[in-house]
Amino acid sequence: MAKRKIVKKKVVKKNIAKGIVYISATFNNTMVTVTDEMGNAIAWSSAGGLGFKGSKKSTPYAAQQAVEDALNKAKEHGIKEVGIKVQGPGSGRETAVKSVGAMEGIKVTFLKDITPLAHNGCRPPKRRRV
């Protein structure tokens, strides 16, 4: 029987200069997505996807690594300018924003907080007792 060839899917390099970095910082994880101005995803990364497990996913260091990974992937597509949209109350929030600003070759144009706030909607979960 003939062996089947495994064909790898080629990554198409897009030439995009401006983009938006969405940072979703929850209490358990930090997700980073880099999109173009229309909202089409170019690159993404998360603390859990980088090998951080359990409570280590929610650390600021894990958030920094996730941002650096996503932006390095996005740089291959020609990203030079980004805006930042931050969502959530997680501990990796501030570190993630700082590490975007510290990335070499990437200029930050704006910073916006898009955390959803309830106007007396659903009842929140009860307080934890430890």
From Swiss-Prot:
What role does it play? Located on the platform of the 30S subunit, it bridges several disparate RNA helices of the 16S rRNA. Forms part of the Shine-Dalgarno cleft in the 70S ribosome.
GO terms (BP aspect): translation
Instruction: Summarize the subunit comment.
Output: Part of the 30S ribosomal subunit. Interacts with proteins S7 and S18. Binds to IF-3.
Top-rank taxon, per record: Bacteria
Sample GO molecular function, one term:
rRNA binding
- The membrane spanning regions, by residue number, are none
Q: Which NCBIfam families does the record associate with it?
A: PRK05309.1, uS11_bact
Residue ranges annotated as coiled coil are none
Name of the featured protein: Small ribosomal subunit protein uS11
Protein's organism: Campylobacter jejuni subsp. jejuni serotype O:2 (strain ATCC 700819 / NCTC 11168)
Alphabetically ordered keywords of this record: Ribonucleoprotein, Ribosomal protein, RNA-binding, rRNA-binding
Alphabetical list of InterPro entries matching this protein = Ribosomal_uS11 (IPR001971), Ribosomal_uS11_bac-type (IPR019981), Ribosomal_uS11_CS (IPR018102), Ribosomal_uS11_sf (IPR036967)
The UniProt family comment states: Belongs to the universal ribosomal protein uS11 family.
Write out the GO cellular component annotations: ribonucleoprotein complex; ribosome
